[in-house]
């Protein structure tokens, strides 16, 4: 779909983009050429821009911000939720193409003392908003101590086993 939008003239692009459902609009926006993205951003009202930004994953928002002129970046950041704005700024501090610049901050975090059953419930509650749910990061005090997968959790026969015991 993004390729079609990249070929539209400046007058039709915003009109057709506004017809897309919200989630599809965000997915399409991410895949568009920076020139088309900028054209749309300049034509969006603040509320339209906020709707698109709110649907993006942080790393996708960072990719967009990196391609835009400063005045457009300022407008994007002003419409982003405070938490997203903070995450965007954190990722932008890393050198381009470094591990930090391509990482995602939207993942499922589990505590080592959680049970498998609690972990599955947490994934169900929070996973919808995460970009990565297949690998779960086990943390203690915001420090990574290990990994486990959704597969490991689902195949564990003891729902009362701790995450620490299966990672």
For every predicted segment, state its role.
Residues 1-167:
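Hydrophobic packing positions in regular secondary-structure scaffolds
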């Amino acid at each position: 779909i993004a390729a079609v939008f990249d070929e539209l003239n400046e007058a039709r692009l915003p009109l057709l983009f506004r017809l897309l459902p919200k989630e599809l609009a965000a997915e399409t926006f991410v895949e568009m050429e920076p020139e088309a993205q900028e054209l749309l951003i300049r034509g969006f009202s603040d509320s339209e821009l906020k709707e698109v930004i709110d649907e993006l994953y942080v790393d996708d928002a960072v990719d967009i911000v990196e391609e835009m002129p400063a005045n457009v970046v300022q407008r994007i950041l002003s419409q982003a939720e405070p938490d997203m704005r903070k995450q965007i700024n954190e990722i932008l501090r890393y050198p381009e193409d470094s591990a930090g610049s391509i990482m995602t901050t939207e993942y499922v975090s589990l505590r080592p003392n959680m049970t498998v059953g609690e972990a599955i419930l947490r994934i169900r509650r929070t996973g919808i908003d995460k970009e990565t749910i297949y690998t779960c990061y086990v943390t203690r005090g915001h420090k990574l101590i290990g990994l486990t997968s959704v597969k490991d959790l689902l195949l564990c026969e003891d729902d009362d086993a701790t995450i620490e015991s299966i990672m």
